[in-house]
Curated annotation (Swiss-Prot):
Positions where Phosphoserine occurs in the chain: 136, 641, 659, 674, 677, 683, 692, 879-881, 911, 1281, 1283, 1296, 1315, 1405, 1479, 1525, 1560, 1651, 1762, 1783
N6-acetyllysine modification, residue list: 1497, 1533
Residue spans of biased composition, Low complexity class: 841-854, 1447-1457
Source organism per UniProt: Mus musculus (Mouse)
Entries under InterPro entries matching the protein: Bromo_WD_repeat, Bromodomain, Bromodomain-like_sf, Bromodomain_CS, WD40/YVTN_repeat-like_dom_sf, WD40_repeat_CS, WD40_repeat_dom_sf, WD40_rpt
Record GO cellular component, one term: nucleus
Renumbered residue ranges of the record's region Mediates interaction with IRS1: 924-1129
Assembly: Interacts (via bromo domain) with acetylated lysine residues on histone H1.4, histone H3 and H4 (in vitro). Interacts with IRS1 and IRS2.
Full protein name: PH-interacting protein
């Protein structure tokens, strides 16, 4: 052995070999050869050891052959594996980095000891490095103590924030208080600049001011008439501005709450508000963006707080429907960036003295809905729905961006789960940390991603939310901390440096589930943060004690919060009852949500009532005529000043004059009384959502309150001196202003310098688009010393900014300048202001919603012609009050919103649903109101392509039933042209050729048409594929939208026209003529070639032609006509010849046979024209005779896309416009459709339209009818009779959507005694559904979605579900467990979220609240149900044990006799060998009390042991069949026990539903192949343990002659047997004794020699081949029909001794409502059972089982232990070990063995083969 070999380990020699293999396989071949030679010489390779132990050297080639299982790169693979393996044990500091050369925690040699935490001593903490404390190492342990940190700071005067304030400190932030202060969702919250005040803005139109330190409600700012969409506090902390969906901006003084201005510059909702940080003397700016696509800059003075009402306005609407969504100012206020729905970012600059637009950045591919400037520089980040964010910075005269792709994943991490399920990533929110080092983006996959703001590198992915996140709030001074909140109710504090969660809070609301968090803000000092939620709560978090917050009430409202207001001409408001400005009214009383005043200790918390006497703190209560309590301001014992008494007397006299006797009677009904100081008026616990019939007391109690709240002069003086929000101290304000000024100057300097620098490269992106400065700027700004502090600036998307409004006329829908929607115009202070507050519902709607409550903001297309709306009996909703202004806006109305006609990505125009008042008696609007909004009436008029009454070949006008050829090339050209000209937003990826394989031309049939309102009006078609040979539909289809556009050739060609042209012979040089604009044009064919090479066979534009005027063009053969001999040519070459009427008629469509019924088209057209003439003479049709007068109703064309009327239809009939009956009927239906769209449902004009439409359709269908008057009379009589019936039913209680005055107590479903009734869940679920129906939030989900209103609903939603269907299914008894009901209810919410993507619309918050409410209550129902199951299971087991103990001696003796076992086993063996499964002959039922007979002999009652109990039962009447043929009964061969009593009843209950449906006398065959079976099969595949099948017996009292029933349900748990008619191989009477095998049995196959049937004896389901064989056999033996009038009755007769519950179950009516596909389950039937005599069950199962239905989850747990394994039995005697895996044959053999030590008997009487160990134990005993 060589010297080198000595001491060489085996590992080293293997390493040499692997290195040589690695080098040999790589580029270093020569080095490999050298190494191989050297290791061979020195014998360094692994050696071989022979059988004697001697070692022998081996060559390299020998080793390669020996280790041929090793790849050449085996060494490299080992290195790859080392890193991940070590990572699991000792994580490295930088995850994902794979290196062999790392050090420290990156080293592959690292150990736990080498990576332990480092702890510095005090001297190290006090050291300085480069003038600052050194940074802690990565493996630094716990942060140093606060004492060491403070001492080091004392030594060196410096500190690091992470040491002084570690992020663990934020774990001590807790929720101080959750206050209910609003009646609706609160989308806006902000702090003032001091952090001592909190402002909340809600959907209930109120802005409230709260004290941060103790949570007191300080003031309510009233005035808005719609939802608050955004708020902003100025930097001087002197005023607050709030924008609303009512298109107004209201500004209040923070010191006195006095209104400073009402700004009206937008024609649609306000989407964002920002106070500019810019400082120029006393001049300041306020910016606002709106859904009308405009941005306004309002100039105001910081000294006087005066705001110029005329803004500098930019209209950024390149096409209708574009909205400005978000905005953000730079730190110095010199830049403003905005995002909008047209994908463009616009940047405005203030450095030239006035705002000017300097850039338009169009690099996002979807809407930009979040934007935020950095805190210290001129960088900003934008987030888009295209799944990307961009960080922008102005460099070298252009805006450059860093792309942040949300699909990026961190290195070394493979995030699975939800991220993979999200098909399209979307950015929902963006934010910067305080130091601008990182950018945080919220993604729709419920994660937050942290990026390096300078490189765009992904740093962390923060996971913890369970729903989408729309709130990101950085800490005001700590760059490590970020707050996030989402719709899942979680508020999470993150450590951005480590990427971990510091603390999380869950907003659980008792009785209502969780509340989705909609906004969150942190106070400027970082001590508090506040959140608001979907239920109207304000949540205050902070450090320290909550003792101050414990002194306030949980519900805080002022009694005057919801009083009606009146508006003057400038939209300033006064309280209607006191005629005072709200801020001048005396201090209000504090009440709860139901209007009950709080005790006096709480009243002192109201500003102005701190020093009041006790009696002055108790409000005087009165009762209104409606029975509601109300607060009266003056107390009976209070001294009233002379001024007060005089004003009060004058007001009372005025009231009497106005109301007359009514006022006296109303006043007399008010019982005034004083509440004692010791008593407290409490509301019922506010658990659960508010009911729709139960208006909150705080809102309704003052609707008719007397005007008694008048302030005295001393009150006004004292009140005017109050300070609600303190101003900033002079030093702080001046310092912040200096900072903002400096930042502004820095931004100007940076911008100017970058503007002068030249481009380094001409990039494709980020080009500066300089716009012409053609805007009229009214205000100029002197840029002096200006500076800003970036504090409290937000970029969150408000609810209005997030709402989807894709098609135009948002400003008209919101409605200030148009009043066409409301039946009653809301007149406010002399101005015509319409505030539509209704949304699609079958019943009453919310009291306070606007256009943002449209719960289906995204739209689709109607794929079918309009059909009749189902007739519903509706009740008129009760109005809560008779107010003149606000109440009109809050009236409950039945309104159907017109679908907004675009998909989520589409930003085209909307078509809001307008209401037309009854009989068209509506206030006329001047056309000028349209022009005020930048629109003209002509823009909205439908094109001539739609309104033309003459048939033309070009352009093609689609009609129902048209068979057309679709040309993909033409459609692609249309899409490209529409995109190029930006006519409307169109997504090329959603075109049909991206969804399916399309040839160049396809034969299609038009099966659906709908027109969409917009600019332009679009035609939406559904095209179905047509087989050209058979003319039948093939089943496929697609949808498309298009309109007639100049310079775009028709790509839909009638089949008739195509076929005529296809066979027309054209040659080069042939002359032709073509119809263009109703004239003949002549030309010559020059050549033929395909338009595109990839479609060589396409005829689309395949000819190159030359017109006579010299122009060349491509033409399609169907556009060219042969020139006849008698053709008229133009006088001048190159001109045209007009078409004659004869030529026009010859070119139109020639109808096919049957398209006009049995008569020719001309005859039918004349008949229908005559009928229409008669119809037009009737008064009921007068409104539909002529087109709608657009001068009188200018908004009509903005609502109705396809206007039509009787005269238009008549004219088209005369011109032979319609190509078939279905085309005509489609247009007739549109009369009703348009009327219903424009008018209020249920109004007389809608009823008239329905009647006229039905009448005309009946007339058209009846081709023998030539006089419409008799038909009119008969239909009129029928309608009158129907209306009388409806009037009779008018007093019937309405649906739950109706307003109810009675206040039923709200119950908690969980506060009830524990019930162990398994069926109790049905009643509990019924109560829960009743509560849900009474909740206001359930209105959109109560009834099925109207497919006429939302035709694309089924395209998106596969399985519709609603609460009415759930209730019907529950009442019909079709839910077998509460889990199934829970699944359907959850389906309702998942369907809604899938169909309505707008996450911050009001309807979305309703769904969140209702879903959380349901989950909160259903949890207790599920818990009780599972508890009942467990109780019954334990009860059943205890019964078994008692029975077993009572019969132990009898069972032991019976089991010990082998001869007895043989006798028992014989019928069992016979019964198991059978032919046709479930072939059950039945006979007529004899009286149930006759003597039971088996084989003609009376039998006594028998004792039967079942798994639940053992009962003695009465005899059953049976009769031996008279026929000689064998009647066969079959027992399932599954691993079950047959229970002829109870199991039969269970199965009969289950089959009663199926039997009730068998009404036909024809033979029926039951098939195995059902959807239930397949679903069950899938379920069983997923379970690790097969379920044990239950075998039961289905019995009849006695057989019927000459009838048989074949009942096959092979896939269910129970199989069917009739014990009363058991006959085995032709011999009757002896019932079978069934053996139930234990778990783990091997399958045993028995062959029936008589029938050849193979029965697989194994657990679980039968094999498919056996099922098929049994199915065929069953069908062959099915010779007699099943009589529905026999089976159920016989079943009931057999169950004569059962209790009423079982009879109810058996006689249950058939399923009602929607029938969900569910797995059959066994019902719990625990009572006496009727069985034949001598039926005994030999039990083999040693497991504790129950017949009760077990919850699937519990059953899964129970089945986990069902695998074969060793079991023991210890009854205080001996212990025997036995196996359960012996076969069935072995089991039978044990019955006949006589050796005492080869088998034993278990506690249940089962024979068990003893193991050797068991024998040894027995011998040892």
């Amino acid at each position: 052995m060589s010297r080198e070999r000595k001491g060489l380990s085996e590992l080293r020699s293997e390493l040499y070999f692997l290195i040589a293999r690695f080098l040999e396989d790589g580029p270093c071949q020569q080095a490999a050869q050298v190494l191989i030679r050297e290791v061979a010489e020195k014998e360094l390779l692994p050696r071989r050891t022979d059988w004697t132990g001697k070692e022998h050297p081996r060559t390299y080639q020998n080793l390669v052959k020996y280790y041929r299982h090793l790849a050449p790169d085996h060494l490299l693979q080992i290195c790859h594996r080392l890193g991940p393996l070590l990572e699991q044990e000792i994580p490295q500091s930088v995850p994902g980095v794979q290196t062999l050369l790392g050090a420290g925690r990156q080293s592959l040699l690292r150990t736990n000891k080498s990576c332990k935490h480092v702890v510095w001593k005090g001297s190290a903490l006090a050291a300085l490095h480069c003038g600052r404390p050194p940074e802690s190492p990565v493996n630094y342990g716990s942060p140093p103590s606060i004492a060491d940190t403070l001492f080091s700071r004392k030594l060196n005067g410096k500190y690091r924030l992470e040491r002084l304030v570690p992020t663990a400190v934020y774990q001590h932030m807790k929720m101080h208080k959750r206050i209910l202060g609003h009646l609706s969702s609160v989308y806006c919250v902000t702090f003032d600049r001091t952090g001592r005040r909190i402002f909340t803005g809600s959907d209930d139109c109120l802005v409230k001011i709260w004290a941060t330190d103790d949570g007191r409600l300080l003031a309510t700012l009233r005035g808005h008439a719609a939802e608050i969409s955004d708020m902003a506090v100025n930097y001087e902390n002197t005023m607050i501005a709030a924008g609303s969906c009512d298109k107004m901006i209201r500004v209040w003084c923070l010191r006195t709450c006095a209104p400073l201005a009402v700004l009206q510059g937008h024609s649609a909702s306000i989407t964002s508000l920002q106070f500019s940080p810019l400082c120029s003397g006393s001049k300041r700016y306020l910016s606002s963006t709106g859904a009308d696509g405009t941005i306004c800059f309002w100039l105001w003075d910081a000294g006087t707080l005066k705001i110029n009402p005329r803004p500098t306005k930019f209209t950024e609407r390149p096409r209708p429907g574009v909205q400005m969504i978000c905005s953000s100012f730079s730190a110095g206020g010199m830049f403003l960036a905005t995002g909008s729905t047209d994908h463009i970012i616009r940047v405005y600059f203030f450095g030239s003295g006035q705002p000017e637009k300097i850039s338009e950045l169009e690099f996002h591919t979807d809407k930009v809905d979040s934007i935020q400037f950095s805190n210290t520089s001129n960088r900003f980040v934008s987030g888009s729905r295209d799944g990307t964010a961009r960080i922008w910075q102005f460099k070298r005269r252009e805006w450059k961006s860093i792309l942040l792709d949300m699909a990026t994943r961190p290195a070394g991490q493979n995030l699975q789960g939800i991220e993979d399920k999200i098909t399209k990533m979307k950015v929902t929110m963006v934010a910067w940390d305080r130091h601008d080092n990182t950018v945080i983006t919220a993604v729709n996959n419920m994660t937050l991603k942290v990026w390096n703001s300078y490189t765009g590198q992904l740093i962390h992915v923060l996971m913890g939310h369970e729903d989408e996140v729309f709130v990101l709030e950085p800490h005001p001074f700590d760059p490590r901390v970020l707050f996030s909140a989402g719709h899942d109710g979680n508020v999470i504090v993150w450590d951005l440096a480590r990427g971990v969660k510091v603390r999380s809070y869950f907003n659980m609301i008792e009785g209502q589930g969780h509340g989705a968090v909609f906004d969150c803000k942190c106070s400027p000092d970082g001590q508090h943060f506040a959140c608001t939620d979907s239920h109207g709560h304000l949540l205050i978090f902070g450090f320290g004690s909550s003792s101050k917050y414990d002194k306030i009430a949980d519900q805080m409202f002022f009694h005057s919060d919801y009083r009606p207001l009146i508006r003057d001409a400038n939209n300033f408001v006064l309280d209607e009852q006191t005629q005072q400005a709200p801020h001048l009214m005396p201090p209000p009383f504090l009440v709860d949500v139901d209007g009950n005043p709080h005790p006096s200790r709480y009243q002192r918390l109201v500003p102005g009532r701190e020093n009041c006497r006790e009696e002055q703190l108790i409000p005087q209560m009165g009762v209104t005529s409606s029975g509601l309590n109300q607060v009266l301001s003056q107390q009976a014992n209070q001294d009233i000043s002379p001024l007060d008494s005089m004003i009060q007397r004058l007001q009372q006299e005025q009231d009497l004059r106005r109301s007359g006797e009514a006022g006296v009677s109303n006043a007399s009904r008010v019982n005034r009384g004083s509440v004692s100081s010791t008593s407290e008026v409490h509301s019922p616990p506010n658990i659960g959502l508010r009911r729709s019939g139960q208006i909150e007391g705080v809102r309704q109690m003052h609707s008719n309150a007397p005007r008694s709240e008048i302030a005295t002069e001393r009150d006004l003086v004292a009140w005017s001196r109050r300070v609600v929000v303190p101003e900033l101290s002079a030093g702080v304000a001046s310092r912040q202003e200096e900072w903002r000024t400096a930042k502004g100057e820095e931004e100007i300097k940076s911008y100017r310098s970058e503007e002068k620098r030249k481009h380094l490269t001409v990039a494709k992106e980020n080009k500066i688009l300089t716009v012409s400065k053609n805007h009229a700027h009214e205000h100029f700004l002197d840029l002096g010393d200006s500076k800003k502090q970036q504090a409290n600036q937000h970029n969150y998307r408000t609810r209005s900014a997030l709402e989807e409004t894709p098609r135009p006329l948002e400003e008209l829908e919101n409605g200030t300048s148009s009043s066409d929607e409301g039946e009653v115009l809301a007149v406010s202070g002399g101005t015509s202001e319409e505030e539509e507050r209704a949304w699609h519902s079958d019943g009453s709607s919310s009291d306070y919603s606007s256009d943002y409550s449209d719960w289906t903001a995204d739209a689709g297309i109607n794929l079918q012609p309009p059909k009749k709306v189902p007739k519903h009996k509706t009740k008129k909703p009760e109005s809560s009050s008779d107010e003149e202004e606000e109440s009109e806006n809050q009236k409950q109305k039945h309104i159907k919103k017109e679908r907004k006609k675009a998909n989520e990505e589409k930003d085209g125009p909307t078509s809001p649903k307008k209401k037309k008042p009854k009989e068209r008696k509506q206030k006329r609007l001047a056309v000028g109101e349209l022009t005020e909004n930048g629109l003209t009436l002509e823009e909205w008029l439908p094109s001539a392509w739609i309104t033309d009454t003459l048939p033309r070949r070009c352009p093609f006008v689609p009609q129902m039933g048209d068979e057309v050829y679709y040309f993909r090339q033409g459609h692609e050209a249309y899409v490209e042209m529409a995109r190029k000209n930006k006519i409307y937003s169109i997504n090329p990826k959603k075109q049909p050729w991206h969804k399916m394989e399309l040839r160049e031309q396809e034969l299609m049939k038009i099966v659906g048409i709908k027109y969409e309102v917009g600019l332009p009006t679009l035609c939406c078609l559904k095209l179905a594929f047509l087989d050209p040979d058979t003319g039948k539909l093939t089943g496929g289809s697609f949808t498309m939208k298009y309109h007639d556009m100049p310079d775009v050739i028709d790509f839909l060609v009638l089949r008739q026209q195509f076929d005529d042209a296809k066979y027309r012979p054209w040659n080069i040089g042939d002359r032709f003529r073509s119809v263009i604009d109703d004239a003949w044009w002549f030309g010559t064919i020059e050549s033929q070639e395909p338009l595109q090479p990839e479609y060589p066979d396409s005829l689309f534009q395949c000819y190159n032609v030359c017109w006579d005027n010299g122009d060349t063009e491509k033409m399609s053969p169907w556009d060219m006509e042969l020139i006849p001999n008698n053709a008229v040519f133009p006088e001048e070459l190159g001109t045209s010849v007009p078409l004659t009427d004869v030529e026009c008629r010859s070119l139109i469509y020639k109808p096919l046979d049957g398209e006009w019924g049995a008569n020719p088209r001309d005859e039918e057209c004349e008949r229908i024209v005559g009928g229409i003439n008669q119809l037009m003479t009737l008064d009921i049709a007068s409104a539909f005779v002529a087109p709608v007068d657009l001068q009188a109703y200018p908004m009509y064309c903005t609502v109705v896309a396809y206007p039509t009327d009787l005269s238009t239809i008549k004219q088209r009939l005369e011109n032979r416009f319609y190509r078939r009956f279905s085309s005509l009927m489609w247009e007739v239906r549109y009369i009703e459709h348009n009327t219903r769209t424009f008018n209020e449902p249920g109004s007389p004009i809608v009823k008239s339209a329905k009647f006229v439409t039905d009448l005309l359709l009946h007339f058209i269908k009846d081709q023998t009818c030539y006089n419409i008057i008799p038909l009119y009379n008969s239909m009129k009589k029928k309608v009158l009779s129907d209306s009388e019936e409806e009037e009779k039913d008018a007093d019937v209680p309405g649906t739950s959507t109706r307003k109810r005055k009675d206040h039923q107590p709200r119950r908690r479903l969980r506060n009830r005694a524990q019930s162990y009734d398994i069926q109790a869940w049905k009643k509990q679920c019924q109560e829960l559904l009743n509560l849900i129906f009474q909740c206001e939030d359930s209105e959109p989900f109560r009834q099925p979605v109207d497919l006429l209103e939302y035709p694309d609903y089924r395209d998106i939603i596969d399985t519709p579900m609603d609460f009415a269907t759930v209730r019907e299914t529950l009442e019909a008894g079709n839910y077998e467990s509460p889990m199934e009901l829970c699944k359907d209810v959850r389906l309702i919410f998942s369907n809604f979220k899938a169909y309505t993507p707008s996450k911050r619309s009001r309807i979305y918050s309703m769904s969140l609240r209702l879903s959380a409410f349901f989950e909160e209550h259903i949890s207790s129902v599920l818990s009780d149900y599972k508890s009942a199951l467990r109780f019954h299971k334990r009860n059943t087991i205890s019964k078994k044990r008692k029975k077993r103990n009572r019969s132990s001696s009898l069972s032991s003796s019976a089991a010990s006799s082998p001869e007895r076992k043989k006798r028992i086993l014989k019928p069992q063996l016979k019964s198991e060998v059978s032919t046709s499964p479930f072939s059950i002959p039945t006979r007529s039922v004899l009286p149930r009390h006759n003597a039971a007979q088996m084989n003609g002999k009376p039998e006594s009652s028998s004792v039967v042991r079942t798994r639940s109990n053992r009962v003695a039962v009465d005899p059953v009447v049976t009769e031996q069949p008279s026929t000689s043929s064998a009647t066969k009964a079959f027992v399932s061969k599954t691993n079950t026990s047959a229970m002829p009593g109870k199991a039969m009843l269970e199965n009969s209950v289950r089959h009663s539903k199926a039997l009730s449906t068998l009404s036909s006398p024809d033979p029926l065959t039951f098939s195995h192949a059902t959807k239930n079976n397949s679903a069950k099969e899938n379920m069983e595949k997923e379970k690790p343990v097969k379920r044990k099948m239950k075998s039961s017996v289905f019995s009849k009292a006695s057989p019927l002659p000459k009838s048989a029933a074949v009942i096959e349900q092979g896939e269910c748990k129970n199989n069917v047997l009739i014990p009363g008619t058991i006959q085995v191989n032709g011999h009757g009477g002896q019932p079978s004794k069934l053996v139930k095998r234990g778990p783990g049995r091997k399958p045993k196959v028995e062959v029936n020699t008589s029938s050849g049937e193979v029965t697989h004896k194994k657990r679980g389901r039968k094999p498919k081949n056996l099922q098929c064989a049994k199915q065929e056999n069953s069908e062959q033996n099915n010779m007699h029909p099943i009589r529905a009038d026999v089976l159920p009755s016989s079943t009931c007769n057999f169950l004569s001794e059962t209790n009423a519950v079982k009879e109810d179950l058996l006689q249950k009516k058939s399923r009602g409502g929607r029938k969900p596909k569910r797995k059959m389950k066994t019902h719990n039937l625990d009572s006496e059972l009727i069985v034949p005599t001598n039926v005994k069950v030999l039990r083999r199962s040693n497991r504790k089982k129950t017949d009760d239905p077990i919850d699937e989850e519990e059953e899964f747990e129970e089945l986990k232990g069902s695998e074969p394994h060793m079991r023991t039995r210890n009854q205080g005697r001996r212990t025997a070990f036995y196996n359960e895996d012996d076969s069935e044959e072995e089991q039978r053999q044990l019955l006949f063995e006589d050796t005492s030590l080869t088998f034993g008997t278990s506690s249940r009487g089962r024979v068990r083969k003893l193991t050797e160990k068991a024998k040894a134990n027995l011998i040892g005993w």
